[in-house]
A protein has these predicted regions:
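Catalytic phosphate/metal-binding cores of nucleic-acid and nucleotide-processing enzymes, i.e., regions
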Residues: 1-142
Length: 142
C-alpha cells in the first residue's frame, strides 16, 4: 500500500475515534483542502499528528508535531498541545506526548517539581481519551 493512502486511512480512523467520543473531528486536509492544519482537527486544545508506521521514531514525530503546532500558533495565536496518535499494523492506537503536557492535561502538575521536558509518555487510546475528556470538560466549564 502506498504510504500516502495509508496515512489518509490512519487520519480517517483517528477522526472516527474522536467522533465516537462526541467530537466533530475530521481530517485537517479535508477541513480546508490545504496544509497548515493538524492531521485531525475539531478537537479543542490539541494538535494531532497521526502516524501509521511499523518503525516509528516517536521522538521525531513529537518534534514534528511541536514544530507544526508552533507554526500554527504563529499564524493564529491558538496554543495547542501536540500529541502523536500512532499504531503499527494490527495493533491498537496509542497516544504519545511530552510528560509536562500530559501533566497539564491531567491537572496534577505540581509547580515546585522539576520534570525533564524531553520525557515522553505513551499510553493506549482508551486511557488517553479519558484523561483528555476530563481536561476538556473542566477547561470548557461544561
Amino acid at each position: 500500500m502506498n504510504s500516502r493512502a495509508k496515512g489518509v486511512r490512519g487520519e480517517l480512523q483517528v477522526a472516527h475515534l474522536f467522533q465516537k467520543s462526541g467530537y466533530k473531528a475530521e481530517r485537517g486536509q479535508q477541513h480546508d483542502g490545504r496544509s497548515g492544519h493538524a492531521d485531525v482537527v475539531g478537537v479543542p486544545y490539541i494538535w494531532i499528528e497521526v502516524k501509521r508506521d511499523q518503525d516509528l521514531n516517536v521522538l521525531k514525530a513529537i518534534e514534528q508535531a511541536e514544530r507544526d503546532s508552533a507554526g500554527y500558533y504563529e499564524r493564529t495565536r491558538e496554543d495547542l498541545l501536540p500529541v502523536v496518535i500512532h499504531r503499527k499494523n494490527r495493533e491498537e492506537w496509542k497516544c504519545t506526548m511530552r510528560l509536562l503536557d500530559l501533566l497539564s492535561l491531567s491537572g496534577s502538575m505540581p509547580f515546585a517539581v522539576a520534570v525533564p521536558t524531553d520525557g515522553l509518555v505513551t499510553m493506549t487510546w482508551s486511557d488517553w481519551i479519558r484523561v483528555y475528556m476530563a481536561y476538556e470538560t473542566e477547561r470548557s466549564g461544561a
